[in-house]
A protein has these predicted regions:
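N-terminal Rossmann-like NAD(P)+-binding subdomain of aldehyde/semialdehyde dehydrogenases
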Residues: 1-60, 88, 228
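Structural motif
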Residues: 67-71, 87-88, 94-97, 127-130, ...
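Rossmann-like NAD(P) dinucleotide-binding subdomain of oxidoreductase/dehydrogenase enzymes
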Residues: 50-189
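Conserved active-site and cofactor/substrate-binding residues in soluble primary-metabolism enzymes
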Residues: 6, 10, 64, 84, ...
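ALDH superfamily catalytic-core signature
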Residues: 84, 91, 159-287
Length: 388
């Protein structure tokens, strides 16, 4: 963990240089989080041997390593995910074989090497951490079929392949996180939090907000706050241009992932200021036929108007059902006066993380906005998302 943390800056630079995605400063933070926060949380947790013993009832709870973990690493968070998965594997005495994304193999392997060298120096077996030097779909599938358990972080296709491998799998699929802003919400807090979350590493954390659903009673105020804070509200013609840039041939356009709002606007043929933070498209449909209703992994945000709280719930439910089952949902609301609405929200959302008045990128991964939520860069989606 110390070795990984000491290399957080060069690893961040390497990841951005290799992939052409994200923000160096934010990747430094992610690497630090993956090493420091995870170590501090789990260093004193017993993971093997006798975990519990009750002599009165004659019961012992014993944990054993699973064996070899297949770790699929995404191009969006290569070094931080590699650090996280190798550390938790070492902590549980499991071997791990990493399958990097072809676009991020150099930085992913470098992160794994740093952790391996430090682990071996500390007495771990040689080869406890391994990787595929020349990654391919065939080798990744072979690895998943051969391992004892799979930790799969990646696109829907990769996660589906992990679930179809015949081995236990913990998959991190698409997020498509909706953020509902209730009429009782603190508007400045809500908008600032969403911008803070959505711009972090150019929107590549899978828990980041993909859509914002706003009560019609405060819609104009929220709209104005976004503009005041440096976001760009697209007009109808510009919205159509960005639509054609988000989805290409039925899939997310890789050219927009982790790019700045200015770069994406240029790709769409729209002239905006270089310092624009987020491109906001005001749309109506939450169906998959609406490109803005998809997960975008970039500083592009869909904005919906809700006629009531139930309408907002219905829209959020549909967005999750189509593109983010089991992942994350977010609500901005007065927590003192609106307890019934909050209860209705978390009972309706089929997500493992329901965040209240919290930036979803930073809040979803734990130990930042809520210290009781364990830190993790693998945000599993539970039974809703098909996890084992």
């Amino acid at each position: 963990a110390i070795a990984a943390n000491q290399n957080r800056i060069p690893l961040a630079k390497m990841a951005v240089e290799e992939t052409g995605m994200g923000v160096v400063e934010d990747k430094v933070i992610k690497n630090h989080y993956a090493a420091e926060y995870v170590y501090n949380k789990y260093k004193d947790v017993k993971t093997c041997g006798v975990l519990e013993q009750d002599d009165n009832y004659g019961i012992k709870k014993i944990a054993e390593p699973i064996g070899v973990i297949a770790a699929v690493i995404p191009t969006t968070n290569p070094t931080s995910t590699a650090i996280f998965k190798t550390l938790i594997s070492l902590k549980t005495r499991n071997g791990i074989i990493i399958s990097p994304h072809p676009r991020a193999k150099k930085s992913t392997i470098e992160a794994a090497k740093i952790v391996l060298e430090a682990a071996v120096k500390a007495g771990a077996p040689e080869g406890i951490i391994s990787w595929i030097d020349v990654p391919s779909l065939e080798l990744t599938n072979l690895l998943m079929q051969s391992a004892d358990i799979i930790l799969a972080t990646g696109g829907p296709g990769m996660v589906k392949a992990a679930y179809s491998s015949g081995k236990p799998a913990l998959g991190v699929g698409p997020g498509n996180t909706p953020a509902v802003i209730d009429e009782t919400a603190d508007i400045v807090l809500a908008v600032n939090s969403i911008i803070h979350s959505k711009t972090f590493d150019n929107g590549m954390i899978c828990a980041s907000e993909q859509s914002v659903i706003v009560s019609d009673k405060i819609y104009e105020q929220v709209r104005n706050e976004f503009m005041k804070r440096g976001c760009y509200l697209l007009n109808a013609e510009q919205t159509e241009k960005v639509r054609k840039t988000i989805i290409i041939n039925g899939a997310l356009n890789a050219k927009i992932v982790g790019q700045s709002a200015y770069t994406i606007a240029k790709l769409a043929g729209i002239d905006v200021d270089e310092n624009i933070k987020i491109l906001v498209g005001e749309v109506e449909s939450v169906e998959l036929s609406e490109e803005f209703a998809h997960e975008k992994l970039s500083p592009v945000l869909a904005m919906y108007k809700a006629s009531s709280f139930d309408d907002a719930l219905s829209k959020a439910y549909r967005l999750i059902e189509d593109g983010g089952l089991g992942h994350t949902s977010s609500l901005y609301i007065n927590t003192v006066t609106e307890k019934e609405k909050i209860e209705k929200f978390y009972n309706t959302m089929k997500t493992c993380r329901v965040l209240i008045n919290t930036p979803s990128s930073q809040g979803g991964i734990g130990d930042i906005y809520n210290f009781k939520l364990a830190p993790s860069l693998t945000l599993g989606c539970g039974s809703w998302g098909g996890n084992s």
